[in-house]
């Protein structure tokens, strides 16, 4: 294992503060055989990393560059890794209504597989992509820096149940509200059956 990562592991547990990886600018020392699979699992040298604490440690020093590369960053080295989709996976979603008098209304909070908890809104926006080959929806939330979390399949279904209709630039859209913001997912006409289901649930 590269020296910088080995030193990081040795120091693990001595500090609970998040490493300032956005401020570190060590030399790039090449790519290593580490991969984050589309299901959120981490692999090193082809084998899954079974220790959750180790995965969270590596996740804490993960950074995405402007060119899209994913790097593990320590004070002494930058190492490239492979990410098949998003680096993190959303595993738990809570929807709550703010207290009476608040302007935000519904607030969605997401927990990731590496322990991050984010409140979906202006600082942690939600976006949707169409899944290649199936036209299914893939929701992503910005967690930190340029790093996103992809919703797990069960959470996608939970999110769809919260869909409502809004006009966006003259187009009727399905999407979800959180922290005073509307995040559009698709045009109502694109998935009429889903629109009917969402409208029926909203009237119930």
Residue ranges and their predicted role:
Residues 1-204:
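Long, non-globular segments of proteins
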